[in-house]
């Protein structure tokens, strides 16, 4: 009897899907993903938005995209977006990226620029990481890690590039609706496939601006709460959250925010900018002055 009821329910679901247009099926799948993974997919606002999306009758894929985007902003917040095939192709052409760099400033102070990075392949990751690691000395009097303009991307190569300045423990947490995930330094290194190098014990200054976002903010928070660390510059962009891409039938990606960033201090960050320890319009000069005093 139970089996009969179950089969009947499956048949009814199949009939409903068969009666829906391609555009309605697209919206339906997007809403199901938001229901399951969306950081803010709960409460009256989401229920109202969800119902409106499912009741809509999009006639074109552009209309389906717009309905999906409207729902996405409620379920996932400002860090979520719909990445269409056209957008992906344009991004692939534009995403040449900037190389990280290591230079010596006064004395034995290092200046490490960690730019945005969206690479995913092993070769791309290792090239980015070793551009920094291969230029680091055995010791330093201090280091300036420059995150200005780092709009995000793949955080693991960024963290791995400066792992010698981080402790070998949990460096960040992701706090979702139903879960909290810990990120350790060793996990990051395993993910990118490199061996840990000896620690460099020195004061760390971090530079931020209004473009420091997403993975750039995550890297900033990896240092939050550590002794002998100070940040300088301007408040960040306020995208301190983690999102994941979910493939859609037409090749687009539903990039959905699933968790907020949590520092070792217990502080949870998400849509609000992260203020620097020392606000200044001359962050490099201020950082060097602080390092001289250590």
Question: Where are the regions a protein language model picked out?
Answer:
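Bacterial N-terminal signal peptides
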Residues: 8-14
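Bacterial Sec-dependent signal peptides at the C-terminal "C-region" and cleavage site
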Residues: 15-22
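Terminal peptide-recognition signature
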Residues: 30, 71, 112, 145, ...
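Extended, small/polar residue-biased N-terminal targeting/export presequences
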Residues: 39-107
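STAS-typified acidic loop motif
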Residues: 99-127
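A short, well-ordered alpha-helical element
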Residues: 121-141
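Short, glycine-/small-residue-enriched flexible loop/hinge segments at domain edges that mediate gating
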Residues: 140-155
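Gly/Ser/Thr-rich loop/hinge elements
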Residues: 152-205, 241-251, 258-262, 268
